[in-house]
């Protein structure tokens, strides 16, 4: 499993959070022997906007291939943002003023899903008020349709009680999701 703390807020310009994921995977794969892990078939676990960024790393177009890294064995995403919708121009002004280049917050994850996308386990909570403010129907449901349309092996859960920022889901309907997701990953990589 790969996890990292990504640059956020005022440190998130110039695609810094995506570069954080790249550096974490590079470091772990370069030191796999030292850490006693395999450099291939790794899983990435991430949440919320980090789920969108990690999800983009799993794509052919802007992710792992562009950095000469092995493809993830699975994406394990808790309430990932699919699109920042109306927040895109605000992020551009706050994070990258005057920059017209492609940035992670301008990308809609579902637009980058291809048949070669890694197996994915993703979930959302019906009472996730953060994603509600970002048009819930443009988040999980659209990502789910893209995975299904591209025949990507995946599992999708929508929980009644799993508000935003619950991570492992302790004390919510999502409790235990991480164990189920790890089992899904292990099944995919054999």
Label the model's feature ranges.
Residues 9-39, 169-174:
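Catalytic nucleophile-loop/oxyanion-hole region of alpha/beta-hydrolase
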Residues 67-74, 80-86, 100-141:
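The feature captures the conserved acid-bearing segment of alpha/beta-hydrolase catalytic domains
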Residues 141-144, 148-190:
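C-terminal catalytic histidine-bearing segment of alpha/beta-hydrolase fold enzymes
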Residues 1-8:
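Short, small-residue-biased leader/transition segments that mark boundaries at the very start
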Residues 23-89, 104:
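Primarily recognizes the serine-hydrolase "nucleophile elbow" in alpha/beta-hydrolase
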Residues 13-14, 69-78, 85-95, 99-103, ...:
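Mature catalytic domains of secreted/periplasmic carbohydrate-active enzymes
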Residues 9-11, 48-52, 81-85, 126-130, ...:
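Solvent-exposed loop/turn segments at secondary-structure junctions
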Residues 42, 120, 153-155:
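Hydrophobic anchor at the start of a short beta-strand
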């Amino acid at each position: 499993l790969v996890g990292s703390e990504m640059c956020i807020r005022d440190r998130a310009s110039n695609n810094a959070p995506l570069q954080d994921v790249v550096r974490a995977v590079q470091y772990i794969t370069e030191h796999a022997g030292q850490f006693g892990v395999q450099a291939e078939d790794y899983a990435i676990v991430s949440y919320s906007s980090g789920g969108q960024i990690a999800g983009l790393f799993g794509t052919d177009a802007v992710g792992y291939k562009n950095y000469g890294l092995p493809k993830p064995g699975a994406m394990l995403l808790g309430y990932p943002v699919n699109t920042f919708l109306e927040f895109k121009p605000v992020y551009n002004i706050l994070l990258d003023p005057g920059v017209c280049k492609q940035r992670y917050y301008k990308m809609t994850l579902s637009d980058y899903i291809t048949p070669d996308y890694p197996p994915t386990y993703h979930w959302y909570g019906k009472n996730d008020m953060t994603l509600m403010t970002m048009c819930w129907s443009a988040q999980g449901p659209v990502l789910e349709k893209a995975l299904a349309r591209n025949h990507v092996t995946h599992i999708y859960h929508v929980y009644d009680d799993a508000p935003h920022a619950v991570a492992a889901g302790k004390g919510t309907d999502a409790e235990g999701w991480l164990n189920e997701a790890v089992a899904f990953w292990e099944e995919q990589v054999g």
